[in-house]
């Protein structure tokens, strides 16, 4: 990838521009806000000039409700060969793209998951995506070259690609981000009725709890919530049943004499289930990552779908990638893909890749 257009210069779009510029990609910036556009250009995310020709990739970093119309508009103008969005909802976005007659073969749904609060180009960082998961959601008819280009984008930004279908993505986002945010919002709403003494007591404690969506990003968040309503309802119903069970247990405890005693076994089971669930999430999102990583280098030729095939084989080996880098070999069109894994996984990955006829070395 040599050229890219970033459409939308908020925190995500500007951070992508910064990461691509670091990799030598010529980045062109577009935004309906002249102020945001000037700031993104000033911080070094790219140029606000029009690209002189069709670019390799357009990254659509706009609010969810605008993704489909923006892609449709730029496809009709021939802005880019391929398109990737970064919205947090995929099923409804694909439905809208289809309704607008977009060429879905050139579009890959994308969604980088970053925990940094903030918005706007001044909150951007070139390393924002380092080691973070980045969902890629190709359609059944997505061109292999489009997916390869999207994988290059993710690698250039230092993120870890996770390829899955739209329904699985939306279920995961409902469970892992939207429902927790809803629960936190409901708890925070109770603070409106707390007395001032309680609020002073809770000040430092509350600041350590994961932050609520801010006013500046509330609109985008509610758009994602509304578009993802069906899977969110399903998860909330499960959560409601768990909460009802917990309430029953706690009522039994509350009816006691109030003395300190060994914890109720059902309460311990409740806590343990949460610990077990958290421990299923790899890397920094649950199980601690070992400080030392091992690299496995794989030579990948420039045939369509080779990058996608490699990542499928890595996943098939049961290995979690902790880092990825793609470099062009100076003497050939082939690329070297460096996959960082735990030392424990490196030997297994090397064996599996060689078994699948990949030229791999550690």
From Swiss-Prot:
Top EC class for this record: oxidoreductase
Gene Ontology MF, one: NAD+ binding
- So what does this one do? Probable prephenate dehydrogenase that produces 4-hydroxyphenylpyruvate (4HPP) in the novobiocin biosynthesis pathway. Novobiocin is an aminocoumarin family antibiotic that targets bacterial DNA gyrases.
Checking InterPro entries in the record gives: NAD(P)-bd_dom_sf, PDH_N, Preph/Arog_dehydrog, Prephen_DH
* GO annotation, biological process: antibiotic biosynthetic process; tyrosine biosynthetic process
**Protein name per UniProt:** Probable prephenate dehydrogenase NovF
Catalysed reaction equations from the record? prephenate + NAD(+) = 3-(4-hydroxyphenyl)pyruvate + CO2 + NADH
Which pathway does it operate in? Antibiotic biosynthesis; novobiocin biosynthesis
EC code(s) of this entry: 1.3.1.12
User: SUPFAM superfamilies recorded for this chain?
Assistant: NAD(P)-binding Rossmann-fold domains
Q: Which Pfam families match?
A: PDH_N (PF02153)
Report the family membership.
Belongs to the prephenate/arogenate dehydrogenase family.
Limits of the Prephenate/arogenate dehydrogenase domain = 2-283
Keyword field contains Oxidoreductase: yes
Keywords of the record, alphabetical order, are:
Antibiotic biosynthesis, NAD, Oxidoreductase
Q: Where are the transmembrane segments?
A: none
By its UniProt entry, which Gene3D superfamilies does this protein fall under? Answer: 6-phosphogluconate dehydrogenase C-terminal like domain (1.10.3660.10), NAD(P)-binding Rossmann-like Domain (3.40.50.720)
